[in-house]
Regions:
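Domain-level signal for soluble alpha/beta catalytic cores
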Residues: 1-156
């Protein structure tokens, strides 16, 4: 129950890794009923659409009706995040966030490589910031080293 988290002192709800807007709409509504901020994250595919097939324009239409406090793209490779953000950012005038993963899921486990080391990830994050993302972090495969690099750069 979200009420339990709110009663325990949660200050926001981050609902993440949605593949379509209907499931996100339910989550936002639940948070709003508790008068809590709702941060919502969607998973983009390589063409910038959600895994469920919706375009970013369709996401914006649905989210404009529901008003999340921050709209994120997450749990996808950096290239997919970029593709989604390039489509989303021009359409959304409220806070945007991103956090990519730097591995590949090969069931039953994740495989992490040096394809996106902390420095390369920082370069992607700079680009995302230039596109309009103001809340930036890391998902699966990122480590404290990645977040330290982000903190050092963005706190200058």
């Amino acid at each position: 129950e979200l009420t339990d988290y709110a009663d325990a002192g949660a200050d926001i709800f981050l609902f993440e890794t949605f593949n379509s807007t209907p499931e996100a709409e339910v989550a936002i509504k639940a948070a709003k009923e508790l008068k809590m901020p709702a941060w919502v994250a969607f998973v983009p595919y390589q063409d910038g659409r959600l895994l469920g097939g919706q375009t970013m324009a369709e996401v914006v239409d649905a989210m404009a009706r529901n008003e999340p406090d921050v709209l994120f793209l997450n749990c996808a490779p950096p290239e997919h995040i970029t593709a989604g953000l390039e489509q989303l950012a021009p359409l959304w005038d409220k806070p945007l966030g991103v956090y990519a993963h730097v591995g590949k899921f090969n069931p039953p486990e994740w495989q992490f490589t040096d394809d996106y080391n902390a420095e390369k990830y920082l370069q992607e994050c700079k680009h995302w910031h230039d596109l309009g993302a103001t809340v930036i972090g890391g998902c699966c495969g990122t480590t404290p080293e990645y977040i330290k690099k982000l903190t050092e750069f963005f706190s200058q």
